[in-house]
Amino acid sequence: MTPAITAGLLHELVTHSHAEGITALDVEAVIEHDDRVLLIAEPGPDFTDDTWQLPAGPVLPGQTLTDALHPAVAAIGLTIDEITGYLGHHDHPGAHATTRVFCFTVTVTDPEAICRAAMHGHRWADPGDLPDPFHPAAWRWPATGPGGAARQ
């Protein structure tokens, strides 16, 4: 069971992160449709092989975690209908700072709009092929990962 998303929970998550010295925050969206999870192809470092990731984006100054989900999902041509749950977080150490990534489940108004947008490689992956849902950082594979080539 995922915790209810309340203003108190969102405030606590950010406050706890800042108390740990982590101020760079991102969000990820788990979007399910027809019992599959949406993964987006992102170019690898230095234009190496793509990796498969959940739709994600930064939390900008003045945004709540849930505010930041909307532009992250809109960037791939989808619109959030409802934010349905909070799954947890994971940290990404970087060269200058650690980024904390918060993972939420969402529903979207028209899941097939991603097909019409065609600006991103994507795939709808079987959740059984995915690692532990509480560690979405592990949901990144080379383009040869689960499901084969990107569906455009």
Provide a role label for each language-model segment.
Residues 1-28:
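Acidic, metal-coordinating catalytic segment for phosphate/diphosphate chemistry
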Residues 103-105, 113-147:
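NUDIX/MutT-family hydrolases
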Residues 148-152:
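Acidic/histidine-enriched, glycine/proline-rich intrinsically disordered or flexible terminal extensions
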